[in-house]
A protein has these predicted regions:
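N-terminal secretory signal peptides
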Residues: 1-16, 38-40
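N-terminal export leaders
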Residues: 14-29
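A short, N-terminal "cap"/entry segment at the start of jelly-roll beta-barrel domains
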Residues: 43-118, 209-276, 280, 381-414
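Conserved short histidine dyad/triad with adjacent acidic residue
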Residues: 108, 123-137, 280-294
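Histidine-centered metal-chelating micro-motifs
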Residues: 132-134, 152, 171-172, 176-182, ...
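Glycine- and acidic-residue-biased ligand/ion/polar-headgroup-sensing regions
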Residues: 139-152, 156-157, 296-315
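A short hydrophobic beta-strand segment most commonly corresponding to one strand
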Residues: 143-145, 173, 188-205, 301-302, ...
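Short acidic-glycine-tyrosine-enriched beta hairpin
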Residues: 158-173, 316-334
Length: 414
């Protein structure tokens, strides 16, 4: 049995898994996948003479009658898929991450499974100049952020068809199980999209690709084909907008939220009638950092602009024990489930990131955990000293390198 299997079965801690990954580099390609060259440089593909899934795994003697066959349909799919796939807890730059031919989508792409997530995933799609991806529909929630390029997406068919035009920085929802097709409007350059989806969760529940990809059902409460579906927007709460399309979240409105740290501002979106995926954006000032916290749900975070680092650890945040990840515009990180993490801005501009979480979905599943935040008086004082050192280093580097190319560390000890 492999360590990745142990991680999913609970007999191998996420902490140990992350430490092994960080020792090898940024990302480990999944077994059975065609790993991009960049992933190979950061973690070699593990050679096996026998697939560990060939061994039947049973529950312990005191659970499930001592003979329940342990099932993990999503993990089984990961092992068997031939699509280009990487696994880890971050990628350096989603705009330049290597992609490979992907027949099912009619273009190029790479599948991202972060930190052993089993509810959410990420996918990078690349559309060649003046080309389109294959028309598709899926029985799962999906949000799209435009990493680069410009193009259009057509949703639905017949009288219920809608079309949007998007560009770099656009955010939109793909309504559940609605036929859609992405096209590149640029005749010279490829377009690149980042999708965050709930495919893993749906695979865990139903275990059927046929159902997920070929369900003949219209969720009219989520998509009714109205002409203003992608243009309407409503402010429902102080920091909440109900909308299905945002032209450019890199410059869109954020509302002050001092409870998350001095100078912090955020915005949340309710999109597509989704009940799991909860997107939000947050930015914070130069020379500041967010309060450390942890949450009982998975999260995938894309840096939109700025430069800094994140500290993370399982049970606490101590400067001497925490792991450190540097980030820049285009970096994507997914903190391990219920680990403490804290974001620091060492750049010369406000840092802004886009995050997708599960919101209160785990609570609705009965998971008895709460969001926990480390308030300033309880913070390890050495963390502030570490931050000050990093700011001085960043300032010195900026003065000696007028056009800096930030170095990216991958899970190093702080």
């Amino acid at each position: 049995m492999s360590e990745l299997d142990d991680l999913y079965n609970g007999s191998f801690s996420r902490r140990k898994m992350i430490e092994r990954i960080s020792a090898a580099g940024l990302a480990l390609p999944l077994f059975g996948a065609q790993a991009p060259a960049q992933a190979n440089a950061q973690g070699d593909k593990k050679k096996q003479s026998k697939d560990p899934d060939d061994d039947v795994k049973l529950s312990p003697e005191n659970i499930g009658g001592g003979g329940r066959v342990e099932r993990n349909p999503y993990r089984a799919w990961i092992k068997k898929t031939k699509i280009p796939t990487v696994e880890g807890y971050s990628i350096l730059d989603a705009k330049t991450q290597e992609v490979q031919p992907w027949a099912d989508i009619g273009g190029r792409g790479v599948y991202l499974n972060f930190s052993g997530n089993v509810h959410m995933d990420g996918v990078i799609f690349e559309i060649a100049a003046s080309k389109a991806l294959a028309p598709r529909r899926q029985f799962y929630e999906q949000l799209i952020y435009v990493l680069a390029g410009r193009g259009t997406t057509v949703f639905g068919d017949g009288a219920h068809q809608n079309k949007i035009e998007w560009g770099e920085g656009s955010l939109f929802t793909v309504p559940m199980n609605v036929l859609h097709r992405h096209s590149n409007s640029d005749s010279q350059h490829p377009a690149r999209l980042l999708a965050i989806t709930t495919f893993p969760f749906m695979m865990q529940v139903f275990g059927s690709l046929g159902l997920i990809n070929d369900l003949n059902f219209s969720f009219t409460d989520r998509y009714d084909g109205s002409p203003n579906y992608f243009s309407k927007s409503e402010r429902t709460q102080k920091r909440w907008d109900k909308t299905n399309f945002v032209r450019d979240i890199r410059s869109s409105e954020v509302i002050p939220w001092e409870a998350r740290g001095k100078g912090n501002a955020s915005m949340f979106w309710d999109m597509g009638g989704n009940t799991v995926l909860e997107p939000h954006m947050s930015d914070f000032p130069v020379g500041s950092y967010k309060l450390g916290h942890r949450h009982p749900y998975e999260a995938i975070i894309l840096t939109l602009n700025g430069k800094g680092f994140t500290l993370f650890d399982k049970d606490h945040l101590k400067d001497s024990d925490s792991m450190k990840l540097d980030w820049q515009a285009g970096s994507v990180v997914s903190p391990p489930f219920y680990w403490y993490h804290q974001h620091f801005n060492t750049g010369d501009t406000r840092a802004r990131y886009f995050a997708v979480t599960e919101g209160d979905f785990p609570k609705r599943l009965g998971i008895p955990l709460e969001v926990e935040q480390i308030e300033a008086p309880q913070e390890d004082p050495d963390i502030k000293k570490h931050f000050d050192r990093e700011r001085r280093k960043a300032s010195a580097h900026a003065h000696s390198h007028p056009h800096p190319h930030p170095h990216h560390t991958h899970g190093t000890k702080a």
